[in-house]
């Protein structure tokens, strides 16, 4: 009897001891981090999120729950331990030994343009016998992902894009200085054969052309107007506008041009309209793509005329101006018509999702290129 009582007392002391030990030490030297595989991806592109748990102590963790939430537009393929409502909620269970590091990779698809962050993780641990639970909150640093708008690719728009590209290249050709050499680049179908660099072509085995500097450095400007005065918001057209702007940006930058970008949609971080002055190369490409991803379209948009009318009219360093707007209300149309009278190098892309094209006044038909979304490309 005394021996049995001793066993019971020992078991009780063991239980209480481990419980006190876990309560005090379970989170010590325990690090949890989340990391996206990529800094930025395109809409519809696959990527992964890694959960990294490291237990740098002798005390094992029999059960550790890692809980976090993020935007529901990141479509995770592994649905076990998750639920999706207004947001995506994840609850993963780990068993971590002493001095052990565990990494779990979660595949997902970037379902929609945006800037996504995970700021904190909730941890729930248990004691050795799973009879008690302990909670803590961990701040996650530098866990963010850009999902860039995919370039608009409707066949009708591609035709308009080629036509615009020809117009801009013809205008740029007039600004080239034939006596100032800038470098060599890959041959493109629109290049003149007289610009071919045959020595570089023979050396590399790929067609190369000479690049010239310009008598004056002028830029292409892209303005995006997301202001919507209608009762029903055209969400599909708003997103299509940003995709059209992306296609324009990539096309001009690939030609080695300087590109400026302006949008009255507020940045989700600083709540200011997007203003990126003229620049070129990969740095400008990355900056504009990130700005496009961060544009918040959920609220009321600032007036385009109030924000950008002065910027629009100052066009002394502008080679061409592109406007993207799904709406053609009177004040905005009048502003562009006034500009077009002085500066004819202007193209307005107007996306629409209706079956029939919107009615345009005669004075606007020369200015506007209609971009249909149609059923196969209507909504995101």
Predicted regions and their residues:
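An amphipathic, basic-hydrophobic helix/alpha-beta surface used to engage anionic
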Residues: 14-271
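Exposed, interaction-prone extracellular/peripheral surfaces
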Residues: 189, 193-380
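Feature marks short, highly hydrophobic, charge-poor N-terminal signal-anchor/signal peptide-like helices
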Residues: 1-10
């Amino acid at each position: 009897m005394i021996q049995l009582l001793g066993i019971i007392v020992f078991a009780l002391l063991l239980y209480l001891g481990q419980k006190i030990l876990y309560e005090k030490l379970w989170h010590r030297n325990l690090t949890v981090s989340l990391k996206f595989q990529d800094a930025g991806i395109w809409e519809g592109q696959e990527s992964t999120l890694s959960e990294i748990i490291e237990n740098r102590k002798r005390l094992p963790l029999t059960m550790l729950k890692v809980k976090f939430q993020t935007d529901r537009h990141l479509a995770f393929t592994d649905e076990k331990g998750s639920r999706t409502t207004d947001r995506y909620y994840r609850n993963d269970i780990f068993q971590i030994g002493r001095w052990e590091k565990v990494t779990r990779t979660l595949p997902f698809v970037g379902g929609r343009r945006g800037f996504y962050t995970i700021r904190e993780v909730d941890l729930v641990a248990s004691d050795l016998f799973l009879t008690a639970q302990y909670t803590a909150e961990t701040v996650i640093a530098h866990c963010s992902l850009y999902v860039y708008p995919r370039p608009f690719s409707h066949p009708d728009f591609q035709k308009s894009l080629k036509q615009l590209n020809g117009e801009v290249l013809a205008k740029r050709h007039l600004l080239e200085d034939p006596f100032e050499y800038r470098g060599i680049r890959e041959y493109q179908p629109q290049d003149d054969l007289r610009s071919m660099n045959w020595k570089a072509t023979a050396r590399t085995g790929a067609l190369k052309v000479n690049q010239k500097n310009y008598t004056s450095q002028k830029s292409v400007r892209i303005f995006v107007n997301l202001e919507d005065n209608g009762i029903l918001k055209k969400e599909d057209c708003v997103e299509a506008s940003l995709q059209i702007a992306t296609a324009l940006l990539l096309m001009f930058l690939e030609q080695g041009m300087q590109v400026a970008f302006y949008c009255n949609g507020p940045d989700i971080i600083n709540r200011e309209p997007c203003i990126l002055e003229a620049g070129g190369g990969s740095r400008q490409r990355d900056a504009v793509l990130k700005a496009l991803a961060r544009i918040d379209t959920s609220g009321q948009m600032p007036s385009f005329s109030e924000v950008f009318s002065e910027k629009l009219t100052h066009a002394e360093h502008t080679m061409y101006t592109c406007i993207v707007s799904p709406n053609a209300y009177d004040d905005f149309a009048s502003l562009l018509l006034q500009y077009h009278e002085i500066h004819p190098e202007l193209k307005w892309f107007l996306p629409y999702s209706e079956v029939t094209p919107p009615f345009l006044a005669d004075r606007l038909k020369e200015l506007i290129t209609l971009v249909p979304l149609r059923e196969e490309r209507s909504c995101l």
